[in-house]
């Protein structure tokens, strides 16, 4: 099971080192692939006066220190295309924020590195629509030699390093194979769009973004097939569920989205942002009481990993305090989800 945990934002070097020290047990836990998470810049804060973090250079220095001292794999988010290459020198996983999950240039820039790309599902999107974001990364990486760095990826690196033509053929074959189970023509349309890509990054991005709204609606009744999930795992593409907009200032989690998205990529469940209440006044609110309940529900449905923002004193955190899990609660929640997944054979 993948476990991603850490403070929302790098508040200070001292806080990050304190939290990193407290998380040692998870890096040594059997059956857990641990990633330390924190953001160097919260570029999407509600208010211009809200704390954003230390910035790219200092933030990456602190994350690099965590990596060197504790041996942790690192996950952090990027908001602009130019950030992908320098951040990937430190981070094992580049995270695409939910609000930016359709931004082709950002996805292509992240895919052009050797880091795993974790795409958070937009609160405004259906789970089926996330297939197109995955395709953008797959098409970009099929035009390059890509070697997975994460243990969550397949060890079949030889196939991942094939020529652009053979990789494109494989992706298209996987999506065409999905059509046999769907019988509605939608997967064939998606495959046709994918097969139109060329080795150039720009052409790849354009081909993957060519699906129409009508095609998305048609495919909603049946997700893509198993082959695409395997390709996403090998090429280092994850999806993260973090709730869906439910009126103003509220989110809900439709657990059906987990198996739907898992048809075409490994899926992480973000239990902390799922209890967020966006834009309550000048900051976002939330209710962390519900984190354990949603995490256990997701474990019962079956996911590839969990994402928890955690803090020693959430009430005084500089970002996302109301929905962060107290460090003292994290071990119990992780143990419960592991037990559920083990009991159900996930």
Where are the model-predicted features located?
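Short, well-ordered coil/turn segments that N-cap beta-strands
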Residues: 1, 30-34, 68-74, 90-92, ...
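N-terminal amphipathic alpha-helix/helix-capping segment at the start of soluble metabolic enzymes
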Residues: 1-4, 345-346
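Glycine-rich, proline-tolerant flexible connector loops at the mouths of alpha/beta enzymes
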Residues: 7-13, 35-56, 310-320
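Active-site-adjacent loop and "lid" segments of alpha/beta metabolic enzymes
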Residues: 49-57, 95-100, 248-255, 274-299, ...
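Catalytic beta/alpha-barrel core
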Residues: 55, 72-80, 92-105, 116-127, ...
């Amino acid at each position: 099971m993948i476990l991603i945990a850490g403070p929302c934002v790098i508040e200070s070097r001292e806080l990050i080192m304190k939290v990193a020290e407290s998380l040692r047990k998870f890096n040594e836990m059997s059956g857990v692939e641990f990633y330390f998470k924190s953001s160097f810049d919260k570029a999407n804060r509600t208010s211009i006066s809200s704390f954003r973090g230390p910035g790219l250079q200092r933030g990456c220095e602190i994350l690099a220190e965590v990596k060197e001292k504790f041996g942790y794999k690192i996950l952090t988010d990027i908001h602009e295309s130019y950030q992908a290459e320098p951040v990937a020198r430190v981070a094992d996983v580049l995270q695409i924020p939910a609000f930016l999950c359709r931004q082709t240039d950002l996805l292509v820039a992240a895919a052009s590195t050797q880091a795993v790309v974790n795409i958070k599902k937009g609160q405004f999107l259906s789970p089926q629509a996330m297939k197109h974001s995955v395709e953008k990364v797959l098409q970009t990486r099929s035009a390059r030699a890509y070697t997975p760095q994460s243990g969550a990826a397949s060890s079949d690196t030889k196939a991942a390093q094939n020529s652009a033509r053979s990789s494109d053929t494989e992706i298209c074959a996987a999506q065409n194979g999905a059509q046999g189970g769907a019988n509605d023509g939608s997967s064939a349309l998606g495959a046709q769009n994918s097969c139109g890509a060329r080795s150039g990054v720009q052409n790849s991005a354009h081909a993957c973004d060519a699906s129409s709204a009508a095609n998305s609606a048609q495919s909603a009744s049946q997700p893509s097939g198993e082959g695409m999930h395997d390709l996403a795992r090998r090429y280092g593409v994850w999806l993260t569920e973090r709730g869906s907009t439910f009126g103003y200032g509220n989110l809900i989690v439709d657990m059906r989205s987990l198996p739907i998205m898992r048809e075409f990529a490994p899926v992480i469940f973000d239990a902390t942002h799922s209890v967020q209440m966006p834009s309550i006044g000048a900051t976002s609110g939330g209710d962390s009481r519900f984190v354990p309940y949603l995490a256990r529900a997701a474990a019962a449905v079956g996911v590839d990993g969990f994402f928890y923002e955690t803090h020693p004193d959430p009430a005084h955190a500089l970002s996302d305090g109301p929905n962060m899990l107290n460090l003292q609660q994290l071990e119990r929640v992780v143990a419960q989800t592991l037990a559920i997944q083990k009991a159900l054979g996930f």
